Amino acid sequence: MCGIVGAIAQRDVAEILLEGLRRLEYRGYDSAGLAVVDAEGHMTRLRRLGKVQMLAQAAEEHPLHGGTGIAHTRWATHGEPSEANAHPHVSEHIVVVHNGIIENHEPLREELKARGYTFVSETDTEVIAHLVNWELKQGGTLREAVLRAIPQLRGAYGTVIMDSRHPDTLLAARSGSPLVIGLGMGENFIASDQLALLPVTRRFIFLEEGDIAEITRRSVNIFDKTGAEVKRQDIESNLQYDAGDKGIYRHYMQKEIYEQPNAIKNTLTGRISHGQVDLSELGPNADELLSKVEHIQILACGTSYNSGMVSRYWFESLAGIPCDVEIASEFRYRKSAVRRNSLMITLSQSGETADTLAGLRLSKELGYLGSLAICNVPGSSLVRESDLALMTNAGTEIGVASTKAFTTQLTVLLMLVAKLSRLKGLDASIEHDIVHGLQALPSRIEQMLSQDKRIEALAEDFSDKHHALFLGRGDQYPIALEGALKLKEISYIHAEAYAAGELKHGPLALIDADMPVIVVAPNNELLEKLKSNIEEVRARGGQLYVFADQDAGFVSSDNMHIIEMPHVEEVIAPIFYTVPLQLLAYHVALIKGTDVDQPRNLAKSVTVE
């Protein structure tokens, strides 16, 4: 959600800002803008509703010169998508971009109106611009004005502030929304995501909660909320912006579906040795902590929540450890009882999901045994704030609908299950079967992808549908949830998932000839139960689409389409059966003509509540 890029240099920075915004497009947005100040203090601002390319075209028509600038992509929260609501916002010579939500913007707006300020947008961000302007009028430097203004804000914010009268300085403040400073040679940068700055630097400082930074071309000074100077370590990033172009693929989502065999190989690299899972990257003290674990609490949102749901079956059935999975936005606002020696596991592709981060911070107050983050972005807030972290190493994921981040999360979770089973002294065959399954997984998915054309043909049946039902049992139920989420995310078809045994408790009332029912049916101990559920749907005229193990004994009929899947090891079946559901959602969206990579109203990284 929302992207920030800022730069202060001797050279013109407009193209640096635009390239940074292009690299943040995957997060989702509805408008874009930038402001540049030259050495004489002349400020030029451009804003456009729509894509960054429209802003870039405007910049070509109105060349921007100046060595100090800030830019932003907006995902609407307060106020509709419009040019007037696009950032940067201005209060005389003060220019502001902001990610997050200012919860007390209404009373602040009334106070500022009473002081004579006029608001020209519906946004909460304009409050920051006027508030800093007011505080600056009371005296002191821009930094002092920001230090007085920031404590008046309630909510989450990552904000960068520029004064056109003093173009030698940028101010930034962080609370709940990430900001990272990029260090150059005689120039410095700031962004909401290090990906935006990789063309200009590899050295970064990640701002911590409550930090306020003063940035010039040759210096970066960081202060806490009291104004006391603090030191933050700079790091050399090896992160690769490896999305590149789409190559032979039509969309990033399609590309990322097909990248999954290699992504999983990357996840496994260096982590399997002599037939065992090797997670020594966790550090020398990790085994001591993990051996104490008597309960696991998983927090996540969206697709990551579904991967947590799958892993619950694994932790309990394979490692013998009770496990609960909760939506992070629910966990943080309820009173919960902490189980003895409970490990908090957080799942997030970006590592910046606001509710998941808040849940992690709450867990530290509640007295959990420790915390472990599973994430795709090194150096993200979730990774930095957790006791332990495991990277999925999926590579940059651009499509808003997560694919390879999901399957690599599951791969990491299954490795963790194997390690915990060994630490608990359980039968060595458990780890052996997991390792064997994971090593086979990339080739199994490659086999599955060869059926893409058949799934594409099936997708035609969904083009005029308004609803769909997904069914699964056991550890395939969360895969049904994920399949339904993918379909609704990118095709805008209302889709729901149920545990197949729940059909008679309500969903069966929805079944008719216009309701497609998608079933995942591996050949496991629940197959016969699942067949009974399928017959209940057939008897009521439902249109069935069954992704079934080739040995499961299904036969296609008028209202039952069987898509045979190669037999796979049972332990990896949930990961494997995810892929055909991803392809189905992709092809349905393609037929319907929706924006596959950036579906309406959605953002890649949800950094506000």
Swiss-Prot record:
Record key words, sorted: Aminotransferase, Cytoplasm, Glutamine amidotransferase, Repeat, Transferase
InterPro entries according to UniProt: GATase_2_dom, GFAT, GFAT_N, GlmS/AgaS_SIS, GlmS/FrlB_SIS, Ntn_hydrolases_N, SIS_dom, SIS_dom_sf
- Tell me, what is an example of a GO biological process annotation in this record? fructose 6-phosphate metabolic process
User: Its Gene Ontology molecular function terms?
Assistant: carbohydrate derivative binding; glutamine-fructose-6-phosphate transaminase (isomerizing) activity
Give every Glutamine amidotransferase type-2 domain span. Answer: 2-218
What EC identifiers does the entry list? 2.6.1.16
What is this enzyme's catalytic activity, as reactions?
D-fructose 6-phosphate + L-glutamine = D-glucosamine 6-phosphate + L-glutamate
Q: Does the keyword Repeat apply?
A: yes
- What GO terms fall under cellular component here? cytosol
Domain SIS as annotated: residue spans: 286-426, 458-599
Instruction: Name the source's superkingdom.
Output: Bacteria
Q: What is its main location?
A: cytoplasm
Among SUPFAM superfamilies, the record links this protein to: N-terminal nucleophile aminohydrolases (Ntn hydrolases) (SSF56235), SIS domain (SSF53697)
Q: Name one Pfam family in it.
A: GATase_6
Q: Where in the cell is it found?
A: Cytoplasm
Enzyme class, spelled out: transferase
Q: Which residues form the active site?
A: C2 (nucleophile), K604 (for fru-6p isomerization activity)
Q: What does this protein do?
A: Catalyzes the first step in hexosamine metabolism, converting fructose-6P into glucosamine-6P using glutamine as a nitrogen source.
**Subunit structure, as described in the record:** Homodimer.
Which HAMAP family does the UniProt entry name for this protein?
GlmS (MF_00164)
This protein is called what? Glutamine--fructose-6-phosphate aminotransferase [isomerizing]
Lineage per the UniProt record: Bacteria, Pseudomonadati, Pseudomonadota, Gammaproteobacteria, Enterobacterales
